[in-house]
Amino acid sequence: MDLLRLREKGIFLSQRRRKWLIFMAISGVSGYGAYKVYHLPSVARKRKRLFKLFGAIVSVAELISDSAETLSMVSRDVKDFLNSDSDEIPNSLKQIAKITTSNEFTDSLSRVSQAVTIGAFRGYKSESSIGDSGIEKSSDSSVVDRVIDKVFSEAGTGFVSVVVGSFAKNLVLGFYSGKVESGVKCEGSDSSETPRWVTLLGDDKCRELLADCIERFTSTAIGVYLDKTMDINTYDQIFEGLTNPKHQDSVKDVLVSVCNGALETIVRTSHDVFTSSRSKNVIEEIEDDDFKSNGSARSKMVSESGDGVKSNGWTEAIATTLAVPSNRRFMFDVTGRVTLETTRSIIAFIMVKTFQGFRKSINVVHEEVTDRGRQAVEYVGAKSSVIITVCLALYLHIISGCVRNSPIGVSQHF
């Protein structure tokens, strides 16, 4: 009995040890496999990405918590400031303003906006250049050309006009409201403070920007104009329009109006200059003498001398002007040219009118002579036909009388 028990107990222990050995072997193999799989390159890359993802999630959580604390602090300061009557701005808002006005923040913001804009344009361009079938298609027009086409369409022009109008309106309202709030008058103010926009325009960078804009705009406009008018002669078109018979009356009216206005302006300006300058100088000198000498007789002389100056202002001014040799030469040249052109115009007009009169008289004489000759020919023809008719009738009457009274027959007479 004891042997049977010991045998059964040994068999049970051996089976139990065998299970443990099998379990340990399986555990070792699985652990080794897990170790190998864990240290594979692909698994290592995925593991690093997963760790980075977890790190990013943790950083975002920390950022959210920190920003929540910051927002709560800023909102609390703003709430306290709005509820209080103090004029001092909280320190949190001052620090935020310092951050927003710092060079690092503006540079970072400009770089981020630049990168976002470039990425958006590249993505839009790549998407537009690839068709639905995945084959790249050649785009004839660029993004800028398509944007300009959209802007210059009917809907685009309406949208742009609304946007520009609202922007200008809000800009003007904000400018004047800021002036009113700061206590600066818009016009006629006695304050010596220079407006902010004047200071901005007077800045070196703003002047460089304006100069670059004007240069670009001018060069572009001139280039486009030269390209468009390369094969066009502007002066030929102007003279063709002026010499067109359809525009003769309009051109005459325009030239007459321009010449009349120019002459009127020259005469009026020269008269005002010659009279006012000389009269003012003489009157000022005489008034100085009046103040020194004190008398009513002097004032009377002033009025008389003023009248004399006004009456003799033209002659004195012309004499003074002609005293200069260059002015005299110029005056003689202009006078000679005007006289020559006037004489030429008068002679041409007289010749044209004389030629027209000769033509009319010749035509009248020719018509009169032709009418009289035709009437004479008609009269002579009528009279000659009557005479011939009478002669023939008389001749036939005589012949018939002779034949009737003679005893010889008609055949014997002929």
UniProtKB/Swiss-Prot annotation:
Disulfide bonds: none annotated. InterPro entries: DUF2045 (IPR019141). GO terms for cellular component: membrane. Its main location: membrane. Keywords: Membrane, Transmembrane, Transmembrane helix. It is found in: Membrane. The chain crosses the membrane at residues 20-40, 379-399. It is a multi-pass membrane protein. One of its GO terms (molecular function) is carbohydrate binding. PANTHER family: PROTEIN PHLOEM PROTEIN 2-LIKE A10, ZGC:172139. This is Protein PHLOEM PROTEIN 2-LIKE A10. It comes from Arabidopsis thaliana.
